[in-house]
Swiss-Prot record:
Name of this protein: Allantoinase
Residues holding Zn(2+) 2: 146, 185, 239
Entry's cofactor comment: Binds 2 Zn(2+) ions per subunit.
Modification comment: Carboxylation allows a single lysine to coordinate two zinc ions.
Family: Belongs to the metallo-dependent hydrolases superfamily. Allantoinase family.
Function: Catalyzes the conversion of allantoin (5-ureidohydantoin) to allantoic acid by hydrolytic cleavage of the five-member hydantoin ring.
Pathway: Nitrogen metabolism; (S)-allantoin degradation; allantoate from (S)-allantoin: step 1/1
Length: 448
């Protein structure tokens, strides 16, 4: 006897969209295909909506412990749940202390207990001072590691710091021995420092964008690829914003380098031309690119050259968005709109097949992070689903946001679909009518 049968939906399978049934038992997908409704204890009618696999967001900053006024696991995971993301991997920075050793990871694990509405896991960090702790941190069960090439963090003890190329290579050698994946924020520090030194206060939107050019991203990507060839380390590039960087990564893939790449919805939905009007709310690193560059990035996405999409949800308190474009916090709050905003822009407006979007938001990140139970609608996988109604539009308001600090550059945007129901391991955790349902039931993944 099945616990639940989902019927009446357009199910987004790896092979394409099918109008079929999905049977769930003990939180797992047990059957796909026509089901006699007498074989299920409960029937859920999707009423013609798309049934997507729950999204897997591999790039969020929830800032806990240490900076919980910025977000926190409770509000951050509720935001993900409301948008159809059922699994996340949380970055090692913005929390204090950063996740750069076993003890700091343990503090994060304790802070996360009982707070999450979706399933979760964590990165470890590579910083200049923790090479001797990487093996122990790897054995603690982090799913991957993260480093910055450009300056980051602060002078506060325990905060995250960037590595130089020597530190990058040294860390790569150690991580390669463990078979670990290293995720890299790729912007060239020397190029950025030289350009920032020429900025005149107050720094406007155009000057800020010019201070972190595509060339800085491409150089850092190429330097990292060279280090990967030398060390054999598996690598992943986060939040890539330019087609030129994608082209360099594509060439490396053809040469056999073990590399993947993500981009973020804001690089497809927002442009440098809008930045002055949006203000520091839309400041991010790398910055938004001009529409001409954005069009090239869209071509890369539609052509399958980008492995997946992630939010890079990097929230802060409103006061940190005050000031000019140099001093304001660089980060966008966006994880609640992981699915709907890209379904509208990619599937409805540009004709991307829904199964391709499913690969971008769920299947590919789950595979790369070795989250074997996640990422696709297939027998044996966790019964994580997002129901997307493409027949309804809505305009996003601050009141609809579950973030601790209710600001986002997407507020005021009309989105041509709605996430109307979300299930985690077969249990409904969100509906459009009721909002978040029940108590936190998210589980820690992949820590051993």
């Amino acid at each position: 006897m099945l616990d639940l049968c989902i019927t009446g939906g357009r199910v987004v399978l790896p092979s394409g969209v099918e109008e079929t049934d999905v049977g769930i038992q003990a939180g797992k997908i047990a059957r796909i295909g026509p089901i006699n409704k007498k074989e299920a204890r409960c029937i859920m009618n999707a009423n013609g909506q798309y049934v997507f696999p729950g999204a897997v967001d591999t790039h969020v900053h929830f800032s806990e412990p240490g900076r919980t006024e910025w977000e926190g696991f409770f509000t951050g995971s509720r935001s993900l749940a409301a948008g159809g993301t059922t699994t996340y991997v949380e970055m090692p920075l913005n929390a204090l202390p950063a996740t750069t050793n076993r003890a700091n990871l343990q503090r994060k694990l304790e802070a996360a207990k009982g707070q999450n509405y979706v399933d979760y896991s964590f990165y470890g960090g590579l910083v200049p001072t923790n090479l001797h702790e990487l093996a122990d941190l790897s054995a603690s069960g982090v799913v991957a590691f993260k480093c910055f090439l450009s300056p980051c963090g602060s002078d506060i003890p325990g905060d995250f710091r960037n590595v130089d190329l020597n530190g990058l290579r040294a860390g790569m050698r150690l991580l390669a021995e463990k078979g670990q994946l290293l995720c890299v924020h790729a912007e060239d520090p020397s190029m950025i420092s030289q350009l920032e030194a020429k900025l005149l206060s107050p720094v406007g939107a155009d000057a800020y964008v010019a201070s972190r050019p595509v060339e800085a991203e491409v150089k850092a990507v190429c330097d990292t690829l060279a280090a990967a060839r030398e060390t054999g380390c598996r690598i992943h590039f986060v939040h890539i914003s330019s087609a030129a960087a994608i082209e360099a990564i594509e060439r490396a893939k053809e040469e056999g380098v073990d590399v993947t790449v993500e981009s973020c919805p804001h690089y497809f939905l927002l442009s440098a031309e809008e930045l002055a009007e949006l203000g520091p709310l839309a400041k991010c690193q790398p910055p938004l690119r001009p529409k001409q560059e954005q069009a090239k990035l869209w071509a890369c996405l539609l052509d399958g050259q980008i492995d997946w999409l992630a939010s890079d949800h990097s929230p802060c308190t409103p006061d940190l968005k005050d000031g000019d474009f140099l001093t304001a916090w660089g980060g966008i709050s966006g994880c609640q709109n992981n699915i709907d905003i890209m379904f509208d822009a990619a599937v409805k407006r540009r004709g991307m097949p829904p199964e391709q979007l499913a690969r971008l938001i769920a299947t590919n990140p789950a595979k790369r992070m070795n989250l074997r139970e996640k990422g696709e609608i297939a027998i044996g996988k966790d019964a994580d689903f997002a129901f997307v109604d493409d027949r309804q539009s809505y305009t996003l308001t601050k009141e609809q946001l579950y973030y601790k600090n209710k600001h986002s550059p997407y507020v005021g945007r009309t989105i041509g679909c709605k996430v109307r129901r979300v299930l985690l391991r077969g249990q409904t955790i969100y509906t459009e009518e009721k909002g978040i349902i029940g108590k936190p039931s998210g589980e820690l993944l992949h820590i051993h």
